[in-house]
Swiss-Prot record:
Pfam families: Nckap1. GO terms for biological process: actin filament organization; actin nucleation; multidimensional cell growth; positive regulation of DNA-templated transcription; trichome morphogenesis. Belongs to the HEM-1/HEM-2 family. The gene is NAP1. This is Protein NAP1. Expressed in roots, root hairs, hypocotyls, cotyledons, stems, leaves, trichomes, and flowers. Residues 1-20, 1299-1312, 1320-1329 have a biased composition (Polar residues). Involved in regulation of actin and microtubule organization. Part of a WAVE complex that activates the Arp2/3 complex. PANTHER family: MEMBRANE-ASSOCIATED PROTEIN HEM (PTHR12093:SF10), NCK-ASSOCIATED PROTEIN 1 (PTHR12093). Binds PIR. It comes from Arabidopsis thaliana. Residues 1-24, 1299-1425 are annotated as: Disordered. One of its GO terms (cellular component) is nucleus.
């Protein structure tokens, strides 16, 4: 061979495959490659001890057993290599000669399908007879050119064929040796050697059955062709021997039946001996009724017992092996079925199984037979499942093809009379029964196998559950019953593996190729119960492992005395044992007597290696069970059984078993309780888990067991194939991650079920606590209700009776969901970390991330509905509902989930530091990771409310303090998302960061609008200056001409209205913030309010004072929100920095000439105008005040800078008034200028032909005086008599509140040109609302900006411009604070006489018609002006 091997005798010999001839009989050392490191080390140590040890007989006999164990390991190694070859070749079909495209691209065989496939089909014909040059000369030439390269790729697999051939010869020799020399192979006498013998027998069968799955024929033929092409047409040395070997095992079962014919009688004896244990394991009723797997006494449950049937229960641990012996034994030794007792044994096992596993997930099946004759299919797994690669041949078809013909032949021979008549009749009868059994058992298996195993799984579920409860309560009884625990684990292991081995199998009832899938229910909940029971039982054993070791040590200590006593009995003395055997017995006693005594809690500290004891006992067994020994097992039993106690060998076997509980308890537990083989079905495992975990019978606590299975998956990897270790570990990690994903998906599902309209949402639609209290109070007042009618006056049932009985199921569903949620959270919280390779999975952390991640996803999902933004109040209720569920789960975990939810809300709300509080910048790494939710909400408010990009007709309603729309904005009207309750919900959700973000966005938007105003102011400066001069000079013509030339006046008005909307919205937001702060942090709110009252009034303001004012303005406790807000904007953008801003009053006064007034009307229901022009008043007042503050602040800064430079003396800087008073006086002066000239323009523009806009403009000016804290209400009185305004308001408020003033034709009469219709005109069409007092009381509470009474109105007329601003400022602050209370009465609240006159049904003329025909009104005012 090209690849040298470490066990070759020399380098030269190892260079050629022919060296196998010199290595065939080297013994176990030649198999080092197929053994693990531990087994290889034991081989070398055994060889060295053999050379040193003088006890030739004993050590040689013991070495034979070691060889048996090694050959079993070699079989696993050979099958691992074949399994790997099949994987590389993408699972070919060598029987049907079907090879995929991936097969040829794998790099093992030359990519010349025609020649290679022909060689395989024509096996065993030599290639020289096939005339390959005629088949494909090009491929043949290519093979000749690359022969050496192809030989190197095939040599490792040719060596595998040689090793298979050598294994056959050595294994057969060992099997023959054991069969011919061991005098007894009964489970109760010689179980250790029996298991070694049968394990080797089954391994031999499996290797040769599995060998057919690799392309042996093609491998040998192609290799020989390449060898001949490169060696002058000379065949390789081993060609003919391999041809004979492969041909003899084609098909494998015929070769196996011939090779194993010589051991057939011994196999039949063994299978008959294990029959009782198989019958017992199949009888679930007997197992349950007689308590074979129960620590309770079968007939007296109150009496505790070690085990009802200790020996038989212990033997149940081996039933899985016994079943495999039966299935494979009768398959390769069919003559043994003709025993009378064998029929029932085979029937029981065949009825329960459809397949036999060969290696890992490979099963004993012939693909050709399945596809061509039986139509095998897959019904359980998905199309991409790994199990699609499994090559199925059903077990029953194997029996029909290879066992039934032998039975029929025996039947024919018996019928022909070739044997004695009596024996012939018996043989014929038995053969006929076997024939009937084989023919019928297939149908029975298809119908009953799943039912049988489901019943067995239910039994094991119950018994293991009882065991766990019992041993948890009585741990001291676990150690004596440890063998019974192993039996229960082994049976459960067998059932779980059977379930997944048969998942996806489909069979046929006849040769008509009708595919009948085996009904393996993927929703079977018993699998989860078994996994959980096994896991908990193993945990109990590990928990009390010291107690089990202590019990075993005490048993062995007592066993030493019993064995010493038996060695001194007369029978043993009379046997005259040879020195070798006697020495071994003495060493056994010494081993047992040298065991340290178990004392109290020091058991865990005892280290005791009993491997030498077990080796010596195996040596004794090999001697006394050998037919060549003068003293055999029967002699020893007869010599010691007369004592009335256990025989010598029985004592030794029991001591051997208990010794394994001292130093090999973990390996014993792993053997019986490990489910590592489930790795090969892990995709099915995942499917069943998902179907059952959260099903009606699923249990949250089972997820621990499903996950812990993965820890043992990497143990399935073969050490001789290094890449498997990595792959299996990676698959185990992926399996755990997949299950964790399913578990967390289920956890999310439970939370989402509760957090739905059908969950806790349905409870929210029931009676509120106040309603329930009223309902109970009402019910308690009913005396002695009738029994027949439990209803009360309101139609409700009395307490104790169901109002909606159909809701019972929903309530029970909620209770079940809550129970599952709390159980699952508790289980995940208490679960130990899952360790797979170097990965550690802590389920508590996954649960935390799941709950918090689910909350974040649901929060972001609930943020927007299908139509548009979710209402903040609804979003808040959803958050509270979800947090209630999280709090429910939090009670069962040791984690602070509430803190995590707060962090999520903070993360979604934090878009940067609060501008008025923080001085740091937002970290760069948080630019894209925080504030996503608040950005969505703020952008929506900006686009749909402030900017109205959808054109929904957004209007601000001062009276109700919200924005309204003429059509829905998304899914809601604007009023349902902008009132104070909704904004307070927004503040509670997003906190100060959300408020600041929305405030900053409105500031940026308003800054852009103010910049447009400044741009227009500068571009029209000359025209505005000319208009201002003409206004002062009284030149109306020049004024009108200049105003008409101002560019884009209507556009600027639109900008100002939009800025006013932003001011109004920010004012609402500040009020909502203040209300929330007062509710949740009243001390902080009162502290801010107190600080604002004592802030020093100075210009320029210090940075700290400015920040405090910003905070106060943000929570609605500042004196003037609008002007302070605009002032901050102008300071940030550097506005109002030139003299053009002094023209603002004149520029704003020119707005009175705009066409916007022609399309507006006042609406008393909203307290505003139909085109939102009342927001212009806020903008004008705020911009004038803000710009004046900024202008004066800059002047003072410049003066102080000049003073510091020594240009002026300090006396020049002294002022008569404080800077704040000066600023307020300047603002008041500018506002009075605006009012004066605006009123002048309004009244001058009125004429008989154009008077429809007059009322709107007058109301606008009145509202401006009301809004501005710097103007007295009487400011307009000097220009427009208040009798006119009172008449206008009386006309509006005595009519229908929702009737706006629309555009009227200039040709209408005066009474119609000023209003829609007078009350007298409305009387015929619209019913009166009642008396004036009634109408005023209806409209008064929510009339918006207007002051409360006539005294308050006219009390302000005594203020003049020369009054000091300090007292004015204090009054303005107080008025601003009381705006929501004292100004709610509206303009009609002048006096009772006015109310009565304006709203009565008297026949006298109404005030507005009197004003319309009077010449003492606006005309005389205009002339006076």
């Amino acid at each position: 061979m090209a690849n040298s091997r470490q066990y070759y005798p020399s380098q030269d010999e190892s260079m050629s495959p022919t060296s196998v001839r010199s290595r065939e009989w080297e013994g176990p050392s030649r198999w080092t490659e197929y053994l693990g490191p531990e087994m290889a080390a034991s081989v070398s140590s055994t060889r060295s001890s053999k050379q040193i040890d003088g006890h030739v007989g004993g050590s040689t006999k013991a070495l034979n057993i070691q060889w048996v164990v090694q050959m079993i390991e070699v079989a696993d190694g050979l099958m691992a290599k074949m399994y790997r070859l099949n994987q590389i070749l993408e699972y070919p079909d060598p029987v049907g000669h079907v090879f995929s495209e991936a097969f040829w691209k794998a790099g093992v065989f030359p990519n010349h399908p025609r020649i290679c496939t022909l060689l395989s089909k024509k096996f065993p014909e030599h290639f020289s007879k096939l005339q390959l040059e005629r088949i494909d000369k090009f491929s043949l030439d290519s093979l000749h050119d690359g022969a050496e390269l192809h030989l190197q790729s095939l040599e490792p697999w040719i060596q595998l064929l040689l090793d298979l051939m050598a294994f056959r010869e050595q294994a057969l020799r060992l099997i023959l040796d054991l069969s011919s020399t061991v005098i007894t192979l009964l489970p109760h006498q010689n179980s250790l050697i029996l298991h070694a013998f049968m394990d080797l027998f089954c391994a031999f069968v499996r290797v040769n059955l599995f060998a057919e799955k690799i392309p042996r024929k093609m491998l040998l033929q192609v290799y020989n062709l390449l060898h001949a092409l490169s060696r002058n047409d000379r065949d390789c040395d081993f060609y003919h021997r391999l041809v004979q070997f492969i041909d003899s095992y084609d098909p494998p079962l015929k070769g196996l039946q011939e090779d194993l014919n010589f051991v057939s009688p011994r196999i039949g004896e063994v299978l008959e001996a294990v029959g009782p244990s198989i019958f017992l394991s199949a009888d679930t009723r007997k197992l349950r009724n007689e308590g074979f797997l129960s620590p309770y006494h079968p007939r007296f449950p109150d009496i505790l017992t070690n085990s009802a049937h200790p020996m038989r229960a212990q033997d149940l641990a081996n039933v899985t092996s016994y079943r495999e012996w039966v299935l494979l034994g009768y398959l390769v030794c069919p003559d043994e079925l003709l025993r009378v007792t064998s029929i029932d044994i085979a029937l029981v096992v065949l009825k329960e199984n459809l397949v036999v596993t060969l290696f890992r997930d490979e099963v004993s099946l012939y693909q050709m037979v399945c596809e061509k004759e039986f139509g095998i299919g897959i019904s359980f797994a998905s199309a991409d499942s790994i199990n699609l690669t499994m090559q199925y041949i059903l077990l029953h078809e194997d029996y029909q093809l290879y066992v039934l013909p032998r039975v029929l032949e025996s039947k024919k021979m018996a019928k022909s009379g070739r044997t004695k008549q009596k024996e012939a009749d018996l043989e014929y009868s038995v053969a006929k029964q076997v024939e009937k059994m084989i023919s019928e058992v297939h149908e029975q298996a298809l119908q009953l196998c799943d039912t049988i195993h489901r019943e067995r799984r239910i039994l094991l579920k119950q018994e293991i559950g009882r065991m766990v409860l019992f041993f948890t309560d009585q741990p001291s009884l676990l150690a004596p019953n440890i063998q019974m625990v192993f039996s229960a684990l082994a049976l459960a292991q067998s059932e779980v593996l059977w379930y997944f081995q048969h998942a996806g199998i489909a069979s046929s009832r006849s040769k008509a190729a009708r595919v009948i899938p085996v009904d393996i229910d993927p929703n079977d909940p018993t699998i989860g119960f078994l996994l959980d029971g096994m896991d908990r039982l193993c945990c109990l054993v590990r928990k009390y492992i010291s107690a089990a070791r202590g019990y075993a040590l005490s048993y062995l200590s007592s066993s030493a005395g019993r064995i010493r006593y038996l060695m001194g009995t007369p029978g043993i003395v009379a046997l005259d044992l040879d020195p070798t055997l006697k020495g071994l017995f003495q060493r056994i006693v010494q081993h047992l007597e040298s065991i340290p005594k178990a004392q109290g809690e020091n058991v865990s500290a005892i280290t005791c290696d009993l491997s030498d004891f077990r080796k010596d006992w195996l040596s004794i067994l090999m001697i006394v069970t050998s037919s060549r020994s003068s003293i055999n097992i029967r002699h020893l039993e007869k010599a010691t059984v007369s004592t009335g106690k256990e025989g010598l060998l029985s004592e030794g076997n029991a001591a051997y078993n208990w010794s394994r509980c001292v130093d090999e308890l973990e390996s014993q537990l792993s053997k019986h309780g490990s489910l590592k083989k489930l790795y090969f079905y892990h995709q099915h495992l995942t499917t069943v888990f998902r179907n059952t975990m959260f099903g009606p019978e699923g249990r949250p606590q089972h997820c621990c067991a499903w996950l812990s299975v993965a820890s043992s998956f990497p143990e399935c990897a073969s050490l001789i194939i290094p890449e498997e270790v990595t792959k299996f570990g990676r698959d185990a990690v992926l399996y755990v991650e997949s299950l964790i994903e399913s578990i967390m998906g289920g956890l999310e599902g439970l939370i989402n079920i509760l957090d739905s309209e059908g969950g806790f949402g349905a409870l929210e639609s029931q009676l509120l606590p106040e309603q329930a209290a009223a309902y109970l109070n009402n019910a308690s007042r009913i005396s002695a209700p009738s029994v027949k009618s439990p209803r009360v006056v309101g139609g409700f049932t009395l307490p104790g009776h169901e109002s909606y009985p159909e809701n019972n199921k929903s309530i029970k569903m909620l209770e079940a969901a809550i129970q599952r949620l709390t159980n699952l959270c508790s289980i995940l919280n208490d679960m130990e970390p899952i360790c797979v390779i170097n990965h550690v999975f802590v389920l508590r952390e996954y649960m935390r991330e799941c709950i918090l991640g689910n909350f974040k996803r649901r929060f972001l999902t609930a943020l927007q509905t299908d139509n548009d933004l979710q209402r903040p109040s609804v979003l808040e209720s959803l958050i509270r509902r979800h947090m209630g569920i999280v709090h429910l789960a939090e009670q069962h975990v040791s984690m602070d989930l509430t803190q995590g939810i707060r962090e999520i809300l903070l993360t979604e709300a934090f878009s940067g530091p609060v501008s008025s509080l923080h001085t740091f910048e937002k970290p760069a790494e948080q630019q894209q990771t925080t504030g996503s939710a608040v950005e969505v909400v703020c952008n929506w408010y900006m686009d749909n409310i402030i900017k109205d990009v959808s054109g929904a007709g957004i209007l601000f309603a001062p009276r109700h303090k919200y924005f309204k729309s003429t059509r829905p904005v998304g899914g809601y009207f604007a009023e349902s998302v902008t009132d104070l309750k909704e904004l307070q919900a927004f503040v509670r959700i997003f906190g100060g960061y959300g408020v600041d973000r929305l405030d900053r966005m409105m500031k940026v938007h308003t800054a852009a609008l103010v910049n447009c105003i400044e741009t227009s102011l500068r571009s029209n400066r000359e025209l505005i200056e000319a208009a201002a001069a003409s206004m002062h000079s009284g030149d109306r013509v020049e004024r009108d001409a200049s105003v008409r030339q101002i560019v884009d006046l209507d556009t600027v008005i639109g900008f100002c209205i939009e800025a006013g909307q932003a001011l109004a919205f920010d004012d609402l937001l500040a009020e909502a913030s203040g209300a929330v702060l007062e509710d949740n942090a009243s001390l902080i709110h009162s502290m801010i309010s107190g600080i604002v009252e004592h802030i020093p009034e100075e210009i320029p303001e210090k940075k700290e004072i400015r920040r405090i004012k910003g905070v106060a303005n943000g929570v609605g406790v500042a004196g003037d929100h609008d002007s302070e807000w605009v002032r901050l904007i102008l300071e940030e953008v550097g506005g109002a920095n030139d003299n053009s801003w002094s023209l603002l009053p004149y520029f704003f006064a020119s707005f009175m000439t705009s066409n916007a007034w022609n399309t507006t009307g006042f609406n008393i229901e909203t307290g505003g105008f139909s085109n939102n022009i009342h927001c212009l008043a806020r903008c004008i007042s705020a911009v004038i005040a803000g710009s004046e503050y900024v202008r004066l602040q800059r002047e003072y800064q410049q003066q102080h800078q000049s003073l510091s430079n020594g240009h002026h003396s300090s006396e020049n800087l002294d002022s008569e008034f404080p800077p704040r008073v000066t600023a307020e006086a300047s603002i008041k002066s500018s506002m009075l200028l605006f009012v004066k000239f605006a009123a002048s323009i309004v009244l001058d523009s009125w004429s008989e032909a154009n008077r429809s806009h007059l009322v709107a403009k007058l109301i606008f000016l009145d509202q401006l005086c009301e809004i501005s804290p710097y103007l007295p209400r009487s400011s307009l009185e000097s220009h427009v008599p208040y009798t006119i305004l009172r008449s206008i308001y009386t006309q509006y408020y005595s009519n229908t509140p929702s009737t706006p003033l629309s555009t009227a034709s200039p040709y209408h009469s005066p009474s119609v040109s000023l209003i829609h219709a007078s009350p007298s005109m409305k009387n015929s069409t619209t019913p009166q609302r009642g008396s004036g007092s009634g109408s005023s009381s209806t409209a008064a509470p929510d009339s918006g900006y207007f002051k409360g009474s006539s005294s308050s109105l006219y009390g302000q007329e005594h203020y003049t411009e020369s009054e000091t601003g300090n007292s004015r400022n204090n009054e303005n602050n107080n008025n601003n604070k009381q705006r929501g209370s004292s100004r709610r009465s509206g303009p009609l609240d002048y006096s009772s006489s006015h109310k009565g006159g304006s709203g009565s049904n008297s026949t006298g003329p109404s005030p507005l018609p009197r004003f319309a025909v009077s010449r003492s009104g606006p005309i005389s005012y205009k002339q006076h002006n």
